[in-house]
Amino acid sequence: MKHYKKAGRVFWCHLAETAVLGALLLCVGTVRGHRVCTQHDITRIPDTSFQSYAAPAAADANGTGQKIVCLTFDDGPSSTTPLVLETLRQKQVPATFFVMAADNNRKYLPLIQTEADNGHQIALHTASHEYKKIYQSPESYWQDITELLQAISPYTDTEKIRYLRFPGGSTNTVSRKYGGSDIMKCLKAQAQEKGYRYIDWNVCAEDAAGGHPSAEEIYCNILREAQNQTVCVVLMHDTAATKNTAKALPDVIDWFREQGYRFCTVEQMDRLCTQSPPNS
């Protein structure tokens, strides 16, 4: 993708917003017969409590008031993942991959080893990504996580994985349909008991939207939500259906770099913190 002309790209972003938001209302998503995150399922009010502990760390970093950005990718690996990894390599930027292990992406699981070998963080998302299955009960959710850990264990040291992202986010409401109104409260408490940290996001690429948003739209979505943020945790996807995310990624990285952000994995962000994260 060619870099957009700086003078015009912000103006274009505003023109694109109406079309993008309209597409979000029509989201129903499958990738080759398998359910993945869609904007319909993703919470519109994510838990952004990480900002309360990461912002002081950013302000104190080297005494410069440096800003922090974590690039995160859900629902991979897939055929898109090598494109993402190549851009990250070229730009020398770390990322966090919240991986899954469904039937349709099993052949791509060896890419998890490549991600880890390249210094990226591996974190847990889901094995099946079937909301009805995983959110039926706490037992069903943790069984899914166990299946995920077993599937990825040949490619990474699962004993070191202490971070996860709930499908749909920790404040999603779709889970209530299957596990009742307290299912997420219960799962978050159990995650803490098991020594996991869960994290949502405060910048959403909206790349799982119906209609497959263009690279320009994805770029604009990120730019819009990142404006004036000291700490950004960016939600993106590296599925077979989100190759436009890979196309947008070079410009996304360049923009954050131009704005003076420091790139971190989620774990690195925690290490910078001046106090313990709220769900540690």
Give residue spans per PLM region.
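Terminal accessory/targeting
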Residues: 1-70, 86-95, 154, 202, ...
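Catalytic domains of cell-wall/extracellular-matrix polysaccharide-remodeling enzymes
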Residues: 129-235, 239-255, 261-262, 268, ...
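Generic structural signal for hydrophobic
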Residues: 88, 115, 190-191, 256
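Active-site beta->alpha N-cap acidic-glycine motif
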Residues: 38-163, 271-272
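Residue-identity detector for glycine
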Residues: 8, 22, 29, 33, ...
